Amino acid sequence: MSNLEKSLRHEVILDIIESKCICKQEELIIELKECGINVTQATLSRDLHEMNIIRKSFENHEHRYIVTKEDKFIKKFKNIFKSSVRSISMQEYFISVNTLDGMASLIGEFIDRLGDGRIAGTVAKKNHILVLCRSVNATQQIFKELDSLRV
């Protein structure tokens, strides 16, 4: 597959998502096929991830795919987090993040700038960050989110 084919496929996917209510990947595969593009579910899933297209739940319990606008700050945070974090653990209201030497302050600042209301604050040293969460449930959710950035 050439980059041109991939770019064309991405363009068609974007047009379909923006013009139609697509609730399932199977529906999108059918729409692509009608446009002359054959794609496997695995390839489509990768494309959706690369294009920041997510399946969102709405108040009426409807799910559909939408394009998210992930800004440069978030991308930069994810890259730095992934390359700098050695380990992460949690206990009740706290998440402990162990980083490469000198990276804790930067990552702590990134976490603070996310503006997540579930986080009360961070304390950073040379290679360690303590994330203080507002509830045990928030700790578990944030831990999963931060831990998934390491993959």
Swiss-Prot record:
GO terms for cellular component: cytoplasm. Pathway: Amino-acid degradation; L-arginine degradation via ADI pathway. Keywords: Arginine metabolism, Cytoplasm, DNA-binding, Transcription, Transcription regulation. It is found in: Cytoplasm. Its main location: cytoplasm. InterPro entries: Arg_repress, Arg_repress_C, Arg_repress_C_sf, Arg_repress_DNA-bd, WH-like_DNA-bd_sf, WH_DNA-bd_sf. It holds the Pfam family Arg_repressor. One of its GO terms (biological process) is protein complex oligomerization. Gene3D superfamilies: 3.30.1360.40, Winged helix-like DNA-binding domain superfamily/Winged helix DNA-binding domain. GO terms for molecular function: arginine binding; DNA binding; DNA-binding transcription factor activity. The keyword RNA-binding does not apply. SUPFAM superfamilies: C-terminal domain of arginine repressor, Winged helix' DNA-binding domain. Regulates the transcription of the arc operon, involved in arginine catabolism. HAMAP family: Arg_repressor. Belongs to the ArgR family. This is Arginine regulator. It comes from Clostridium perfringens (strain 13 / Type A). The gene is argR1.
